[in-house]
UniProtKB/Swiss-Prot annotation:
It holds the Pfam family tRNA-synt_2b. Its EC number is 6.1.1.15. This is Proline--tRNA ligase. Keywords: Aminoacyl-tRNA synthetase, ATP-binding, Cytoplasm, Ligase, Nucleotide-binding, Protein biosynthesis. Consists of three domains: the N-terminal catalytic domain, the editing domain and the C-terminal anticodon-binding domain. It catalyses: tRNA(Pro) + L-proline + ATP = L-prolyl-tRNA(Pro) + AMP + diphosphate. The keyword tRNA-binding does not apply. It comes from Actinobacillus pleuropneumoniae serotype 5b (strain L20). It is an enzyme of class 6 (ligase). SUPFAM superfamilies: Class II aaRS ABD-related, Class II aaRS and biotin synthetases, YbaK/ProRS associated domain. It is found in: Cytoplasm.
Length: 571
């Protein structure tokens, strides 16, 4: 491609409303342009990258035995009503009525559509297992679109759905897809972790997220220093450290009128925060027990996903308000504790091994110090309620935990029969009876992958694509003063034609621009291999080569240039 025939839309300045690096660089590199909140036009440079990512995904999915289909973005409401998600999905589901007064949605996902398709097309267990995928536009009416294409309202997604006669067959395909995803992200050159995850609104049992490690990520990714253990912080098991020690002091009731929070208590009474506990009151799951207390160490955070899975706790988790707490317990939020508590309590594992700790007295303006289990309070039910912290023991007993930020780019689920049962998707089983199909679901955010690659791979000059395979162009020809030098123009034209004939994705900068502008643009869009052709070097039989990824510069003999590029460039 010649720049003179290309829409080369780079910007010198960073737009003020772009918060994260990927958004800034995608705008500056001329990859995207905003149209409305959360909606973007993809320009030629961006679409080249997007299509290359799609092709890698497509190739690896095909290798894994999946079959490509394409389903409509517009979906009839009846399918969502049939699955039960019409009322459950929430405001992200964009609904509309057509001219025939029929309800439709813009698809945020395609579980209903694929289940309907397969129940119509597949009738016998002999046709299973079946794994179908598509690369298609999705729409989710995000309440606050942000971070460019990282969290936009319209995006491209690869979603696959597998159908099976039983869980054993599903597990086989799930394992294959786990490996396929690992192959995809490895081929893309990304530093990622496959982590245990919560199934969320999709439903089902087993689930893994594929997280690209980046400081701008929205998720906390937990992994061991000495094993393959990795999990989203929502699911990472927190292990209690040490054993409970014997009491060393008598319990005291202390006036604490100005200590309404753990931090105020610690500061005013010079207590180690690890020797305090906090009591959180949440809604219970039953009318008989409308309120439940969750008790954590003062320096730990409640893990809401873990808490709401407890049978006593309402799902979704909901905190009780001040009036409810005061009416039931008789004290305000800042004075709650485990002594004489009149609602069921669940304590975190780390609280169960504490001794001589401080907690609220369930009397406003008072706390107990030097509290000990069994001596001063009966030991309540113990459960894993908290988020892990860096340095915690790994739950597999190998090493300690590290925590890094991650960008979720892929997610695989074992759905089971959640959708097939609701939508009566059955086949004739081996025994001749109707058999509800067991399902798996496998998604990759294609547009998000592009942004995640930039978040992880960039410098002050622009994008550094982690793989030649996804760069918009693999080679840039940058001729110095070509329009004033016949030898430079002749060599550049000949090199361009040769590389094109060899199938190299090459951009030839034939603009009448200063060399500095040309270099800056090619570095900004992240072309991994730059060939600089100058009149003086050419006369000496040499060509300058620059590697965007390593920063290396070297002179290559003119007659060795093609061989050098063939060896170093992945076309």
């Amino acid at each position: 491609m010649r720049t003179s025939q290309y829409l080369f839309s780079t910007l010198k300045e960073t737009p003020n409303d772009a918060q994260v690096v990927s958004h800034q660089l995608m705008l500056r590199a001329g990859m995207i342009r905003p149209m409305a909140s959360g909606l973007y036009n993809w320009l030629p440079t961006g679409i080249k990258v997007l299509k290359k990512v799609e092709n890698i995904i497509r190739e690896e999915m095909n290798k894994g035995g999946a079959i490509e289909v394409l389903m409509p973005v517009v979906q009839p409401a009846e399918l969502w009503q049939e699955s039960g998600r019409w009322n459950d999905y929430g405001a992200e589901l964009l609904r509309f009525v057509d001219r025939g007064s029929r309800d439709f949605v813009l698809g945020p996902t395609h579980e209903e559509v694929i289940t309907d398709l397969v129940r119509r097309e597949v009738s016998s267990y002999k046709q299973l297992p079946l794994n179908l995928y598509q690369i298609q536009t999705k729409f989710r009416d995000e309440v606050r679109p942000r971070f460019g294409v990282m969290r936009s309202r319209e995006f491209v997604m690869k979603d696959a759905y597998s159908f099976h006669v039983d869980k054993a067959s599903l597990q086989e395909t799930y394992d294959v897809m786990y490996q396929v995803y690992s192959n995809i992200f490895t081929r893309l050159g990304l530093d990622f972790r496959a982590v245990q995850a919560d199934t969320g609104s999709i439903g089902g049992s087993a689930s893994h997220e594929f997280q690209v490690l980046a400081s701008s990520g929205e998720d906390d990714v937990v992994f061991s220093t000495e094993s393959d253990f990795a999990a989203n912080i929502e699911l990472a098991e927190a292990v209690a450290v040490g054993e409970r020690q014997a009491p060393t002091a008598e319990m005291q009731l202390v006036d604490t009128p100005n200590a309404k929070t753990i931090n105020e208590l610690v500061e005013q009474f010079n207590l180690p925060i690890g020797k305090t506990v906090k009591t959180l009151i949440v809604k219970g799951a039953t009318e008989e027990q409308p309120l439940v207390a969750l008790v954590l160490r003062g320096d730990h955070e409640l893990n809401e996903i873990k808490a709401q899975k407890h049978p006593l706790v309402a799902d979704p988790l909901e905190f009780a308000d001040e009036a409810e707490i005061k009416a039931k317990i008789g004290a305000g939020v800042g004075s709650l504790g485990v002594i004489n508590l009149n609602v069921p309590a669940i304590i975190d594992r780390s609280v169960a091994v504490m001794s001589d700790f401080g907690c609220g007295a369930n009397i406003d303006g008072k706390h107990y110090f030097n509290v000990n289990w069994e001596r001063d309070a009966a030991m309540p039910e113990v459960a894993d309620l908290r988020n892990v912290v860096e340095g915690d023991p790994s739950p597999d007993g190998k090493g300690v935990l590290q925590i890094k930020r991650g960008i979720e780019v892929g997610h695989i689920f074992q759905l089971g029969t959640k959708y097939s049962e609701a939508m009566k998707a059955t086949v004739q089983g081996e025994d001749g009876k109707p058999l509800v199909m067991t399902m798996g679901c496998y998604g990759i955010g294609v547009t998000r992958v592009v942004a995640a690659a930039i978040e992880q791979h960039h410098d002050e000059r622009g994008i550094i694509w982690p793989s030649d395979e996804i760069a918009p162009f693999t080679v840039a020809i940058v001729p110095m003063n070509m329009h004033k030098s016949e030898s430079v123009q002749q060599f550049s034209e000949e090199l361009y034609r040769t590389l094109k004939a060899q199938g190299v994705d090459v951009i030839f900068d034939d603009r009448k621009e200063r060399p500095g502008v040309m270099f800056a643009d090619m570095e900004l869009i992240g072309v991994p291999h730059m060939v600089v052709i100058g009149e003086k070097n050419l006369a000496n039989g040499e060509i300058e080569y620059k590697n965007r990824r390593t920063g290396e510069k070297q002179m290559i003999a003119k007659d060795q240039l093609l061989a050098f590029l063939k060896e170093n460039v992945k076309a």
